[in-house]
Amino acid sequence: MMDKIIQTLTLTFTFLYYSIPMLIVGLFISQILIESNIIKKIYFIGKIFTRLANLPEECGIAITTSFIEPRMANIMLVDFYKKGIINKKELYISSLIDAFPAMLRHWDSLLPILLATLGFFGIIYFIILVLIGFIQTLIFMAIGKITLKNREYKEDNTDKKIKLNKDVVYTAFKNTIKYGIPIIRDITIASIITSFLIEFGFFDYITEIIKNKAYYLPLSVEEITVAVTQPINYIGAFVLAGEFLNRGILDEIEVVRALLLGSILSSIPALRFLAPYYIGIYGFKDGFNLMMISTLVRILITALFVIITLIL
């Protein structure tokens, strides 16, 4: 039992060591972007999303930021919510709309691996992943359009001149401390709970159940092999899929189907890392709700794509 506790604390410390510094840096940079008016210079990107979803213009600032750094965007939304600028429903919809820019932002980390393992077909698969994120964004934009009141958008005539001085840095630093302390507190507690569940095999148990069910699907052994490898080692799954594709064992549609199924299976172990992130930024209740809504909707959309490949 003592070994489990030590392992839990070690795992927690490791996660916090790698996540908190970047989170604080992201928070500080987001405050600099806001206070210096830099974000207003590229606000036109987010304006498209806010006007189609009946969201306040402030949400457009966060959505614009999500194309640069999704973590900063989420911190901005929480900041707006705590200041009373946006309400709870607008917070949820704005956060869930971030699916497309967040997925697109992975191009620099995911696309090179896909190109190296799957060649040109890796680009096709990445486009499919981006399309899934885009559909998720469209769904929540539609929900915003239906559930939020229509609003009039006035032309923003405020001063958009970029200002970088000591006052901007001081205000950004002060806000970073103000909002950073509760985030660090929540992310630490969430990390301890998540690490405890990891050490006692909760996520492995759930993943194993789902993997066993996957064998009942009408797929080839090779497709299942790629899919069940992905939660364990996604690079290994890409390499395996590339080998099967090059040897003609699987065709392009079968590889897509296998990798999409693998991404569904990967959703459960991914919660180990998503839980501290969401809960740390949004708090326990809202963080858990947003994490589960986003995960479930993405799984449903991905499952729909898998079904389409079975029909083709």
UniProtKB/Swiss-Prot annotation:
Topology of this chain in the membrane: Multi-pass membrane protein
Subcellular localization, as worded in the UniProt entry: Cell membrane
UniProt keywords, alphabetically: Cell membrane, Membrane, Transmembrane, Transmembrane helix
Membrane listed as a keyword: yes
GO cellular component: a single term: plasma membrane
Transmembrane segments: 9-29, 115-135, 187-207, 224-244, 264-284, 292-312
Keyword field contains Membrane: yes
Name by which UniProt lists this protein: Uncharacterized protein MJ1556
Organism: Methanocaldococcus jannaschii (strain ATCC 43067 / DSM 2661 / JAL-1 / JCM 10045 / NBRC 100440)
Lineage: Archaea, Methanobacteriati, Methanobacteriota, Methanomada group, Methanococci
